Amino acid sequence: MHYDFKKVEQDIQGKWNFYTDAKQAQCYVLEMFPYPSGNIHMGHLRNYTIGDVIARYKRACGINVFHPIGWDAFGLPAENAALSYNINPHTWTESNIDNMRCQLKSIGLSYDWDKELATCDPSYYKHEQAFFLDFLKCGLAYRKESLVNWDPVDQTVLANEQVIDGRGWRSGAVVEKRKLFQWFLKITDFAEELLNDLQILDQWPEKVKLMQEKWIGKSQGVVIDFEILGINKTLQVFTTCPHTLFGAAFIAVSFDHPILQYVNDSKVIQLINDFDRKNLISDVSSTIEKFGIDSGLVVKHPLLNVNLPVYIVNFVLMDYATGAIFGCPAHDQRDFEFAKKYSLPVKQVVFPEVDVNLDKEAYVGSGIMKHSDFLDGMTVDEAKKAIVAKLTFLGVCKEITYYRMHDWGISRQRYWGCPIPIIYCKKCGTVPVDKKDLPVTLPKDVDFTKYGNPLDNHPTWKYVKCPSCGMDAERETDTFDTFFESSWYFAAFCGTSNGINKDVCNMLLPVNYYVGGVEHAVLHLLYSRFFCRALTKCGYFNIKEPFSNLITQGMVCHSTYSDEQGNYLFPEEAKKMMENGQHVTVGRAEKMSKSKKNVVNLEYIIDKYGADTARLFILSDTPPERDIEWLDDGIEGASRYLSKLWRVIISYDKFNLNFNKENIIGDDVKYRRSVHKILSGITNDLDFCRLNCAVAKFRELSNIISEMIRTSVNCYVVSEAIYILIRVIEPFIPHIAEKLWENIGGKGMLWNQVWPKADSELLVERNVTIVVQVNGKFVKALTVANDIDDDQLKSMALEIAKNRIGGNVVKDIYVIPKRVINIVAVKPS
């Protein structure tokens, strides 16, 4: 009677095989593939279990599901491990993959392991090297010298997306600006398309689409030329609010603006050099204080006989528009705060119908123009058109559209990445490697003790003959940004060793269900959308969007614990200290992280409770998109449920599905109706990915079955309910479900059995309860046949309410079908 989960799970996992021919697949389910760090964690458990439930359910519905797995295997941690442990990144990565593969299999995930891939395998990255060469031909890849984000700790270039408030996204180091030759992909060629097509992604979370819309950052405005006094130069200023030009109080430029070369005040130059770039504001929601330095430069207002000071500020960035704006404090909150801090004038030029207090905040609404010369009396929209026309006539203005998004810099000065297939020849210049010579592979005899790029420091690897002229030449020693690999892997699963299969991709893509964290909303998801368009342009397939239904699961959180000195404690350490009477501070639940030690070892949980228990807990109570808090009581409760489920079903010795439903009467019908209503609800929940709701319903079904057994309900009704329960729990807790299926005599594997269909007759209520009211006040609840007609219902209601009506006259009777009947009675006239 005891449920031996270790024996059951090992037995069942050995019997599963989920091979699927991609050419025959009808539904593509994919979770964001893991980086092989060495161990899976609770976040992985949630991510992959959500996807597994969807895949298993769709199979049960008779759909041929494609559910592959792979490894996002390039990346900096492997190089760090090489340096720390004197181990080659290849060896470290392969060992981690082996370990994590075993861990994923232990969870019971229904992957087609025959489709497994790793991005560090030359058989994988040779195709992306070919993509790059085709991008080059199509004008989607180019090389230029550019001011780049240099991470001095990781010793590599970072994309704009990887710089958060002036610091490297991984190292946290203050990012420096350097000029280097870099390779870029022209994602901006598709900026408008990437923006507009967000509208067709109706199964993506709105917050993700808003994040991408913000990152693409389309701004339609004008560039106005301001004359810089004293140096015979012009400063181009971008604005989306030209109508506020008469309220301008200052010019603000980036700390990287070329105009700064004309600053000649040594004190100002020193202040610029001393500025800490971690205080750059790259997001409007940033809490960093606004800061500026008066450059000493002055520009002339293009329409007024006034001069404006030029400030160097931390809230204007050179990588957006022209890197310069004019500040109108009265009508922009950011400018308002800056003006108040530096005692700059606040001149109101837009006036609403009701007076506003500009002592507290800027006014950013509509209104009528005043103090604006020829714009006075116009609306904001009229003023925008008029001032643009005037400035254009004067030759100092042009309309323009800018995007916050820039081309994707893909060069990385790292070893553990895909080599860029380019050769540099003094005679021939930049020469692409011939496709027949791909892949360009990484050398394994690399010295990681030196700083900088290991490939550049390699004694022989980079030295080659030019494929065009045969003279001595050198390889490109940069490697691709690792997001290059993850931007097309979903298509790689649809391919063969010869590359992407165009027909299969066109048939199977976009991915029907894509599951992963919202932290990838901009980088990975946006790059994947770009890759679809770029590969389509190059003729690889004809796909616009990579993922049709995006499910962004919430984080797994746990309380933090700390001792009297404020040092973080692991949960097991905190528990022992509290048992010994020592003081432990319990903090709020936060995302599990090694740094805060609020982690739970997944291998320990699976060893102690089993994979099904871990799966059940991680799917219970909380919708997939919301954060879930790990609770020891919760995992214990899940374990108790499985033990009870096993005990109840194994002990039932009257299992028999050969029944005639016509012979089922009385309470047996009531129980069948409850069972089929729950089945219908679970089916509906799974159709809309309400996994926690489905869990609640099958636990309710378990309780009903226990009640039926206790009250000796017809064995056929109980047997049907047990069969339905076993089938509907399989996507969630597949090991115990498969074993119970065996024990009731099921033929074949349960995962391959059809999903049960609720009896439609049982879903229709034969009786309904209707509230009888007189003048809106309750009289009685009346149970009647579902198909009763209104006249009969009114007669019954009048009979029931006759005492309440008394001597009054019935003026009218209102019926809300199947809910309420209200009798309106008034005093006789």
Swiss-Prot record:
Keywords: Aminoacyl-tRNA synthetase, ATP-binding, Cytoplasm, Ligase, Nucleotide-binding, Protein biosynthesis. SUPFAM superfamilies: Anticodon-binding domain of a subclass of class I aminoacyl-tRNA synthetases (SSF47323), Nucleotidylyl transferase (SSF52374), ValRS/IleRS/LeuRS editing domain (SSF50677). Its main location: cytoplasm. CDD domains: Anticodon_Ia_Leu_BEm, LeuRS_core. GO terms for biological process: leucyl-tRNA aminoacylation. Gene3D superfamilies: HUPs, Isoleucyl-tRNA Synthetase, Domain 1, Valyl/Leucyl/Isoleucyl-tRNA synthetase, editing domain. Pfam families: Anticodon_1 (PF08264), tRNA-synt_1 (PF00133), tRNA-synt_1_2 (PF13603), tRNA-synt_1g (PF09334). It is found in: Cytoplasm. It comes from the Bacteria. A motif ('HIGH' region) lies at residues 34-44. A motif ('KMSKS' region) lies at residues 591-595. Its EC number is 6.1.1.4. ATP binds at K594. InterPro entries: aa-tRNA-synth_I_CS, aa-tRNA-synth_Ia, Leu-tRNA-ligase, Leu_tRNA-synth_edit, M/V/L/I-tRNA-synth_anticd-bd, Methionyl/Leucyl_tRNA_Synth, Rossmann-like_a/b/a_fold, tRNAsynth_Ia_anticodon-bd. One of its GO terms (cellular component) is cytosol. One of its GO terms (molecular function) is leucine-tRNA ligase activity. Transmembrane segments: none annotated. It catalyses: tRNA(Leu) + L-leucine + ATP = L-leucyl-tRNA(Leu) + AMP + diphosphate. Belongs to the class-I aminoacyl-tRNA synthetase family. This is Leucine--tRNA ligase.
